[in-house]
Amino acid sequence: MLNKIKTLQGYKLSGLDGEIGKVKEFYFDDKHWTIRYLVADTGNWLTGRQVLISPYALVAVIKEEQHIIINLTKKQIEKSPSLDNDKPVSRQFEETYYTYYGWPMYWGGPYMWGTYPYIVRDRDKWIKANKLGKTWDPHLRSTHDVNGHDIQATDGEIGHVDDFIIDSETWAIRYLIIDTLNWWPGKKVLVSPRWIDRISWSESKVFINLSRETIKQSPEYSEDSLITRDYENELHRHYNKPGYWVDDLADTVLPS
């Protein structure tokens, strides 16, 4: 299911033994464009530290009740490796964090989730997963910080990042919502991270290998409507790009 980040912000987080807080923001990596951590606002509990929840612990998003189910207890979260509010998420912290929970490390292979292109819940496969694959160095970004970044087409600016649309099964970022208000009023469009050429973090700018006119003529995105596969097919046909679901299908040939 596809969900907007801004919609998920404020959702209650329901652990195995009660509510632990609400969704504050997310961290994603800029290689696979996949959510790596949900950042929880725990109120007066666990103050002074970032409470990070990996998608391995996210069981389901219940939109009707505006909450996310987590398969962790409060004690597990409280005893987890601590990261101060003003500290970045380092590789050393991630290794300690993943070791604590016993999850396979997502940077341990070529796919979105290491040895696999999706989150594997079978613990028997986790030990093998951690022994396979070439590791890579993740660079994590905050969805809150990237909001507002300018979008640079091949022939000029077209707007800015307004939000992200994620797939709550794989926790991949499927689209960036681009607000083109400063260029042509009243229209928002979707752009896949796969179409991004590069990102200048120092300039807060995202470079896309598409022209402004091509983007302008793309199927309009309405925040009031659900994103259907028919709409996605139309969008990808317009840009003459293969859908992410094609690659996802190819990636299902996995190590046994």
Regions found by a protein language model. Name each.
Residues 1-256:
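Peripheral interaction segments used for macromolecular assembly
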